[in-house]
Amino acid sequence: MDFKYEKNRIYLENQKGECIAEVTFPQISRNEVNINHTYVNPCLRGQGIADKLVKELAVYLRKNNIKAISTCSYAVDWFENHPEFNDVSK
């Protein structure tokens, strides 16, 4: 998948340039973000796209020494099921 990056957002577009999936993570301090929203277009759900988005974010956060709190229920569950990223999640 060809994810795109913007400040505090990783997303996926369709051929028309429309957002079809995203994870948002506003910065709350210098080295901390809040993963507050995960979205996948209903016609694409069940294909593991949200999992790939949050993993992409976790790798990005680790690489940049940024910690995350999660207020998005999907992200909370994802980090609980991926203890290999405990160093990223607060």
Describe the predicted segments one by one.
Residues G46-V59:
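Conserved acetyl-CoA-binding loop-helix of GNAT-fold acetyltransferases
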Residues E56, Y60-K90:
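C-terminal structural segments of small proteins and small subunits
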Residues M1-Y5:
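Conserved N-terminal entry element of GNAT/NAT acetyltransferase domains
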Residues T38-R45:
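A short, internal acetyl-CoA/4′-phosphopantetheine-binding micro-motif in the GNAT/acyltransferase core
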Residues E6-R9, Q15, V23-E32:
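A conserved beta-strand-loop-helix scaffold within acyl/acetyltransferase catalytic domains
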